[in-house]
């Protein structure tokens, strides 16, 4: 019996390579960042200062889950103020549009009812889960909004486009509550030191 070894040669011609899955989302986010950065939307000079002691805080987040409870409990512990919650979907195809509608809704409040600061919050998630917060229309709305906005999207390692165009970015929803109101004891001490 005889054995013949055959050798084959293959040639692959590649015209285009595209990043698939999470890589394509990261590429899209980076392209949006470049575009918005060129427009000046991320510039520090446009950041609005947060009020030291707001009368009312608007919170845009999911009505379920730990995020809303963390924010409410932390504000209550520090310095209770009136809070208006605008529940939205924080994940999925309509989420960015829902958040834009919530901002529009807050802007239509009468002056005396309008929040002094707004927190947009969501817990952590995958790149895909956080894509609504990388939406270009939402980023522009956050940048142009007349009320200061604190973004609290995800955890320490998560950064979204609205984090760059909000007036203050914090790493967690609990941190957003801490930045929104002072500690009652700090305020009392400040008043006592003033006298």
Predicted regions and their residues:
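Short, glycine/charged-enriched hinge/interface segments at domain edges or termini
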Residues: 1-86
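Short glycine/threonine-rich loop/turn motifs
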Residues: 58-195
């Amino acid at each position: 019996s005889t054995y013949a070894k055959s050798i084959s040669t293959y040639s692959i011609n590649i015209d285009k390579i595209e990043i698939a899955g999470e890589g394509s989302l990261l590429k899209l986010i980076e392209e949006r960042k470049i575009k918005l950065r060129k427009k000046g939307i991320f510039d520090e000079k446009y950041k609005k200062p947060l009020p030291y002691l707001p009368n009312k805080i608007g919170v845009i987040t999911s009505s379920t889950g730990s995020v809303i409870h963390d924010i409410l409990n932390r504000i209550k512990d520090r310095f209770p103020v009136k809070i208006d919650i605008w529940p939205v979907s924080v994940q999925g195809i309509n989420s960015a549009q829902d958040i834009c509608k919530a901002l529009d809704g807050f802007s239509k409040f009468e002056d005396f009812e309008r929040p002094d600061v707004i927190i947009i919050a969501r817990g952590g998630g995958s790149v895909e889960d956080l894509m609504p917060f990388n939406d270009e229309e939402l980023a522009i709305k956050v940048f142009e909004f007349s009320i200061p906005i604190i973004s609290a999207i995800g955890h320490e390692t998560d950064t979204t486009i609205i984090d760059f165009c909000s007036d203050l970015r914090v790493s967690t929803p609990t941190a957003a509550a801490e930045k929104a109101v002072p500690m009652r004891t700090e305020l009392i001490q400040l008043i006592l030191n003033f006298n």
